[in-house]
Regions:
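N-terminal Rossmann-like NAD(P)+-binding domain of SDR-like oxidoreductases, especially those catalyzing
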Residues: 1-116
Length: 116
């Protein structure tokens, strides 16, 4: 039986990192999406010692070209987790439109893409 493949949007955040660790222990292959793949942003994955076990893609503005690239490179994706979005309450108040785009519009784009 083949290992299941999970795509995690927001893999470098707290919940994404813990989910990736959990799924790796269940023998999943993980594809992770993060807005920022700098070393300082991937510290949770590094602390869990799973950074090298995840195929990580960086993308700041989710669009159909990026989604096509991910799904073309990874023909079979069994599960998709959307844990991405603005996590700073102060920033969400200061930048409500950007927060809405990050938290809602990006998810809608993913759902529209996978329904095709």
């Amino acid at each position: 039986m083949r290992n299941k493949i999970a795509l995690i949007f927001g893999v470098s955040g707290q919940d994404g990192a813990y989910l990736a660790d959990f799924l790796l222990k269940k023998k999943y292959k993980i594809i992770g999406i993060t807005r920022n793949n700098s070393k300082s942003n991937l510290f949770r994955l590094k602390k869990l010692k799973i950074e090298k076990k995840i195929k990580i893609y960086q993308n700041k503005s989710l669009n159909s070209d990026f989604l096509k690239k991910i799904f073309n490179k990874n023909k079979i994706i069994n599960e998709i987790y959307y844990l991405s979005g603005e996590t700073s309450p102060l920033r969400s108040i200061k930048e409500p439109i950007q927060t809405f785009e990050s938290n809602v519009i990006s998810l809608i784009k993913i759902l529209e893409f996978i329904k095709l």
